[in-house]
Amino acid sequence: MEAPLRPAADILRRNPQHDYELVQRVGSGTYGDVYKARNVHTGELAAVKIIKLEPGDDFSLIQQEIFMVKECKHCNIVAYFGSYLSREKLWICMEYCGGGSLQDIYHVTGPLSEMQIAYVCRETLQGLAYLHTKGKMHRDIKGANILLTDHGDVKLADFGVAAKITATIAKRKSFIGTPYWMAPEVAAVEKNGGYNQLCDIWAVGITAIELGELQPPMFDLHPMRALFLMSKSNFQPPKLKDKTKWSSTFHNFVKIALTKNPKKRPTAERLLTHTFVGQPGLSRALAVELLDKVSNPDNHAPYSEGDEDDLEPHAIIRHTIRSTNRNSRAERTASEINFDKLQFEPPLRKETEARDEMGLSSEPNFILHWNPFVDGANTGRSTSKRAIPPPLPPKPRVNTYPEDSLPDEEKSSTIKRCPDLEARAPQVLRRQSSPSCVPVAETSSSIGNGDGISKLISENTEGSAQAPQLPRKKDKRDFPKPTINGLPPTPKVLMGACFSKVFDGCPLKINCATSWIHPDTKDQYIIFGTEDGIYTLNLNELHEATMEQLFPRKCTWLYVINNTLMSLSEGKTFQLYSHNLIALFEQAKKPGLAAHIQTHRFPDRILPRKFALTTKIPDTKGCHKCCIVRNPYTGHKYLCGALQSGIVLLQWYEPMQKFMLIKHFDFPLPSPLNVFEMLVIPEQEYPMVCVAISKGSDSSQVVQFETINLNSASSWFTEIGAGSQQLDSIHVTQLERDTVLVCLDKFVKIVNLQGKLKSSKKLASELSFDFRIESVVCLQDSVLAFWKHGMQGKSFKSDEVTQEISDETRVFRLLGSDRVVVLESRPTENPAAHSNLYILAGHENSY
């Protein structure tokens, strides 16, 4: 048992509220909240950071640093007032800087002028020179940690005590800091040894670029990728991008500050003699002018880079489309009447699915668990509060960045050349579990939780080992269950869902659809990507069904992850966009001007970045296809985009809640690109990208995956089409670690990663249909295949037809099957007529 925290004499034990009154919260971070406070005795303002401490935190280091920071008294360093420890919370009271951080400021004002940057750099170097003479280093110089007072004074914050506390508490957090301001010797510290205070000088150079370009170099890269590049011996220091915008003196200052060799990098005192920071006219007036630009933006010209792609030609009136609500039986089509007679299983959840359930990703006390393919068992999903965190999955034996260490034969290998992967894959015990002991890697994917496809279609159908006894299932009344506001679920039976009409007479040309549940209201929405923009439909308001425009640009692809909507939308060209769904819906509810003039209608550079609810993903211009996958071995989530002349790979970074660039590959892709799907391979960090399907090389191999190896530094792709017959594939998706569904013409095949059928005595691994399949949805133990005038379901167990709809008077099209199956139908005689929209509703797992 940990000893209780014992404050030193420098940390007051009494109630801090006897001395400070909290006025308002002004910020929050990973380790605590920052408040504007007032000293009740003197009336002086202060900034108070409140941090909750836990047993195990190294409090001796915190005590030592608090003692040291008391000695730092300089006009360019935030003054320390005192600390309190009360009820296991540490209060750190510092000087209040009313102007805010430079990062907050430039989010509103745009780039600082060269003179303003010079003034900030000079003041920063003065503060660092003082710290360095005291034998201290800051270690976290960046725009967010440089503050302005109301009078334009520059103050360094978050050093010493804050740095130590961050390092101490970080031990209990799975958080990777931002390395973009980090010196190369710090990035390579494990390889090359220690570093000294000259790392702060490098950070000043990076911050100078940040203030002029609104972000540090490599900011669009995933942090781990940036660290990797900085630690390489051939890393080149960054420069200012615009050679003509800035003076040669500024360019030279950045070059000297960013001297790669720390032994040749100047000290703070030496750099203060540089012409850039020694020029006349550097006074507080420059900072006061900057603060005035924040407070009175109307008195200053708005910042804009004139990106014509951002200008919206659409009217500013919010676009709403109402359903015609033709509900009488006489107006219903034959297929709609038959819809009521058929019931369907829930869609199968893939083990490689990236999105989180029900928008509950921010609720760590709940896990979601359902068991597919269990005869006689409840097929629905139960939500249970977990008492003990599940164990982490075993760490795969992969290199963080394997390009330099892969043997030559591995660099050029693809799936079709792989040895038997089943022998290398870790053996995972598959059984039904009590919700409180589901491993993380399995919890996030329902297939891995029970008798999934890999067990049904297994090469070893005769079980050789008896499954361990299941723990007693707790009564469902023991667990709270979130309420979802949408179409009501039917009782949890194996065949309990049907297609329900949700919209009549839709005039839009819809390209894709997905679903999302608002984490606060629990309302379920269908989100449509159309030729006229992104629209939403609230399933909790179907009595007055309306589709509301969320974003005004043509959209061809959608995916929701952690309340973030990723879209492939068109400006001048197609590009990946990221949309903050919660903020966009909140904005739509605001009365008055905000509800009609939305932030996405402003050019990106006019709207302050801090308030941008929709942002472009850098380096994705010209993207025309996308796919997302989750690696079930590591939990990492990847997004891959097909560009006109290559591929871009991004990885989801949880602390920043966004996809960040990992790699860019330049090479020609097949045209047309009929297949574009990622396949996760054991012991490979990054997925393979399947861009074509060809005929197998022998009788046992029914298909061959033509792939691009994103793990290789040189030989990325196979000779696509060389000596093999290309197949016209319709659909490829990885259901489980070694289970892939391939749809070809009239056939659906379940194969392993070598393209061989998953043989089984009890289940069919190949299903045939009497029509050319246009799209498929994999249900719990069957496949639902769609064609022009209907759909047909076939069972893996019996190879028999389970459901069938055929209506020659209607043309059907599957719009999306990501968690909710969305279907469209139009009259055959008039394909341009308004459409009806349906969803497969009734299962709890649909919500």
Curated annotation (Swiss-Prot):
Task: Enumerate the SUPFAM superfamilies for this protein.
Answer: Protein kinase-like (PK-like) (SSF56112)
Give the compositionally biased regions (Basic and acidic residues).
408-423
Presence of keyword Secreted: no
Q: Where is this region: Disordered?
A: 378-487
Q: What keywords appear on the UniProt entry?
A: ATP-binding, Cytoplasm, Kinase, Nucleotide-binding, Phosphoprotein, Serine/threonine-protein kinase, Transferase
**Which reaction is the catalytic activity of this chain?**
L-seryl-[protein] + ATP = O-phospho-L-seryl-[protein] + ADP + H(+); L-threonyl-[protein] + ATP = O-phospho-L-threonyl-[protein] + ADP + H(+)
Where is this protein chiefly located? cytoplasm
Binding-site residues, ATP: 26-34, 49
Q: Give any single GO term for biological process.
A: intracellular signal transduction
Domain spans labelled CNH: 507-820
Q: Where is the composition biased (Polar residues)?
A: 430-448, 457-467
InterPro entries, alphabetically? CNH_dom, Kinase-like_dom_sf, MAPKKKK, Prot_kinase_dom, Protein_kinase_ATP_BS, STE20/SPS1-PAK
* Phosphoserine carried by residues: 335, 433
Any idea which GO molecular function terms this record carries?
ATP binding; MAP kinase kinase kinase kinase activity; protein serine kinase activity; protein serine/threonine kinase activity
Give the multimer and partner information.
Interacts with both SH3 domains of the adapter proteins CRK and CRKL.
Provide the protein name. Mitogen-activated protein kinase kinase kinase kinase 5
Species name: Mus musculus
